[in-house]
């Protein structure tokens, strides 16, 4: 387990418990279970205390944890018959974006998501989840396909933001993000988005302009990273804690503001401590949201989605 900086006291306690058990395995007849169990209880109590009231900055740290389940994990666990589509039919295939046809609970769907990678090699291959223009254009292809065949769209958002490189800008990064956002508003099928980690800026909005937006309990969604905000406003990236507070980027704040429709509970200690339980909770939330659409027709879906976003900001700002 990789520990975050605020989890260091927890790391020490869990480390001591593991050391005791390792000693018992090496030395036959040594009984340490009572001592180890006491340390386990102490660690569980501390974990509960640490996660009872996380600050926005600490939630950012949890949302970025490298061991949280990623898009690939959710697709493998929740979807069957997944058939990926590649390329934007124009320039290249962007590996930061996964997407294809699949079945969810036997319902044919299109699933699209950001994939950050799980080790050095795959993180480089996936560009750390930062999509280039061809990634957003691939997503538009998939949404067009879903619209044509009347398939619900499910997006899984986990990105620090769209890739800001020179080549991406030359190939029309801002236009590609805008087209993807526009396509979200145009398709006449149910569109569900789940923020599973980071929801960074326009790179996230391009997939999250949905009928229903769900966020994992410790995920974040913001126009800019706390570090970027602090650098611009205070010329000091070290003020990221103050920036995180001001940005109102947590799932709980965004639910109060009406941006987030559903907050999905995570296992104690975050999704990284129990991936299977976190994935199961997301699956149940998606199933519930899909069932809520009933027999809504194309015109109703498009009108309702547009109204939802036009109404943002009209309520909840005083919360």
UniProtKB/Swiss-Prot annotation:
Pathway entry: Lipid metabolism; malonyl-CoA biosynthesis; malonyl-CoA from acetyl-CoA: step 1/1
Source superkingdom: Bacteria
Keyword annotations of the record: ATP-binding, Cytoplasm, Fatty acid biosynthesis, Fatty acid metabolism, Lipid biosynthesis, Lipid metabolism, Nucleotide-binding, Transferase
Domain CoA carboxyltransferase C-terminal: start-end pairs: 38-292
Keyword Cytoplasm: yes
InterPro entries noted in UniProt: Acetyl_CoA_COase_a_su, ClpP/crotonase-like_dom_sf, COA_CT_C
Subcellular location: Cytoplasm
One Pfam assignment: ACCA
Gene Ontology molecular function, alphabetical: acetyl-CoA carboxylase activity; ATP binding; carboxyl- or carbamoyltransferase activity
Self-association state and partner proteins as the record states: Acetyl-CoA carboxylase is a heterohexamer composed of biotin carboxyl carrier protein (AccB), biotin carboxylase (AccC) and two subunits each of ACCase subunit alpha (AccA) and ACCase subunit beta (AccD).
Protein family according to the UniProt entry: Belongs to the AccA family.
Protein name (database record): Acetyl-coenzyme A carboxylase carboxyl transferase subunit alpha
Provenance organism: Jannaschia sp. (strain CCS1)
Gene name linked to the record: accA
